[in-house]
Amino acid sequence: FKNDEYLGERIEGRQPCYTNEDIITAIENYVIWKVESGIAAGQRIGREIVTIDIAQPDNASFCTCDDCRAVFNKEGCNTGAVLMMTNRAAAVLAEAYPGVYVSMLAYHGTDAPPKTVRPLDNVRISYCFYISNGDFYCNTHHIDDENCPGNFKMNRLFKKWTEMSPNVDVWYYPFQWYNVAFQDPVFDSLYYDMKYLASQNIGGIMCLTSNSTVSLLASLKSYLASRLAWDASITEAEYYAYALEWFRIVYGEDSGENAYTYFRMCETANDILDECCCFFHYGEDMPGTHHMVDAKYMADNFDFMYELYHDALDVAESAGAEFRVKGYFSGMLYVCIGITYEDRYTNGSAEERAVMAERYRECYDLYVECRRTLTVDTVPVGEHGAVDVPVYLTVPLDLERNPFEYWVVDPI
């Protein structure tokens, strides 16, 4: 709700009060209007009209009025009041238009199931593997990895929802957002997570993979996720064969082979590191650094990866393929230069410094030529709201500074 009269007692998050009868009535009226508007436009219940979504604003600043706090104390979480409101809307909808669901996000403050309130039969729960009590979902480890504290906690909450309701869907986030100068090695987790989710009692998966402006491999994620959604029984070998097919299509037969080899090396570097990291919030607390990959592995293989890049350039089939190769491997140069900067440039021999300077200039020129996105910044618009815009490289080249120190800006 945009009108200030609907806000709860914590206005910084623009959350409404979920126990306010006027707000609940407005939401009841909205779901009826939404269905009737669809029918008037020629849509059909059960076909175009299946689910009406209800979701709180994207923050955890819930109302703290006496009624909301009473529900919180009884149910043990903010989910109680939101689910009670959702049930009210669902009850009205079930009477007027049977067969239409109301979907509630279990997300950022509403991920924990309430103690006593249960969703009605026509309520769907969209569980988001995203954030729980300040902990972000970990992309390095699999959703059901019991040795990953964050994922273990979120998976436990997810299982509670599936035990509580047969109508659970999943929002899944295998994507980058802030520090996107380097690709995220998320594909091993994508394979196992999609297979795991397909084995659970859920209705569907909303797989958010960002877009190609933010991540050069966004379409690969969508392609592989679609393959798994179609057939989750495919083997790991078949999965990566589809990835190789994609690289050959996008970068050309021979150039694609080289790009694919580098792609698999990044996955290996992440497996070796084995540290928790949320890739879509990656860079928020550590801008310019790269904790997604093992630094020693990347440093040891920098020269080989550089050869892969130039070999791919030499066999590029077209100007378009050459441009895509440059864009993709520019991330390799950025992360490898940053990792090896102190050893090979600051403390390196004259020969090592000369090689590093040449590669550093080459990397800088590639980022400018290819308009590589470094991060996505949040820019305020007006009094309320914000817009996310891609941030490109605009600073002058400074050989005496590690690119990790100044290329990627802090998101606000």
Region locations from a protein language model:
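Substrate-binding cleft/loops of secretory-pathway carbohydrate-active enzymes
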Residues: 103-134, 181-189, 214-223, 334-337, ...
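Glycine-rich, aromatic-flanked loop segments that form ligand/cofactor-binding clefts
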Residues: 1-10, 46, 101, 208
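Structured mid-domain segments that build the active-site/substrate or prosthetic-cofactor binding neighborhood
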Residues: 22-25, 33, 145-264, 281, ...
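Gly/Pro-rich turn-and-neighbor structural signature
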Residues: 13-15, 20-162, 172
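Aromatic-lined carbohydrate-binding/catalytic grooves of carbohydrate-active enzymes
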Residues: 1-11, 62-64, 168-179, 214
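Catalytic domains of carbohydrate-active enzymes that cleave complex glycans
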Residues: 201, 228-412
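A structural motif corresponding to the C-terminal end of an alpha-helix
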Residues: 85-100, 157-168, 197-203, 304, ...
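Alpha-helix N-cap and loop-to-helix initiation/capping positions
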Residues: 19-22, 74-84, 146-150, 181-189, ...
